[in-house]
Amino acid sequence: MAGVLTANTAEAQAMHSLRELMFGKHTDSSHDGSHMPIVAHFVSARGEGFVLDESQAAPLLRFDGDDEVFQLTAKPGANGDITFRNDVGEPVLKATRLGGMILFSGAHEDVGDPAAVTGQAPAFTPDRLTLTELWLEMAKSQLRVSHACNHRIDINANKDNIDEGIPNETIINLFAESVSVTTDALIQVASQADSRHALDKLHEVDLIEGRPPSAHIENGVLIVKLDPSRGAWGGHPSSKRIMNVVMTGLDDETRR
């Protein structure tokens, strides 16, 4: 228990330190020139834009032009820097002790690219879907994945065993986000000549309740575990994590 408390305290301190390093005291107003917004848009030196949302329980990031929202984990370094990692343990952002921000992405993920705030951005909010709309999205996604893979792949969702205390809207949002992320991951694998063979034996995707959020393949079925208690973005594995599972057969639980 002491170890858990220590880890949680360190992460909370990291988030507090990040805000102080970069922005001083956060404000929801963009009219105060001495403070930066708690939800901010950044652009890297090479022109890659993204939004960092610190208004939630955990930091969230979305790249411009991408629908996926990534939940990050903040880890303080010995030199006072704070590194944000994704759910496969890779660094995505670094806040330096001098107040700078470095983005690790794409061709520059090893050396990083300095980024600057360009202004305030709206906080991330999940789409409001009904259960019927969720099933329609699943049907559309199943067609897209099957077409990309050149064979039928069913997408199923089982939400029967989820804690009754969790709002139905939260559950639907989580399943909808997971369907979208999983679909994008499989289509991306299928688009790569050197990896699409990994989908040859895949015939089904099952979305189920489980902790921690993870993914694995069993007898041609991609099983994606979702944790509604972590919300719409933290409760499912990212597209990158799912791609790694499909291509290697292994799930990296570095963060979870």
Regions found by a protein language model. Give the residues of each.
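N-terminal Sec/ER secretory leader and immediately downstream segment
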Residues: A14-A116
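Bacterial N-terminal signal peptides
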Residues: M1-V4
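Charged, amphipathic alpha-helical linkers/stalks
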Residues: A115, Q120-K159
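Lipid interaction determinants
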Residues: Q71-L72, L103-T132, V224-H236, M247, ...
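Sec/Tat signal peptide C-region and signal peptidase I cleavage site
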Residues: N8-A12
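A eukaryote-biased signal for long
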Residues: K140-R256
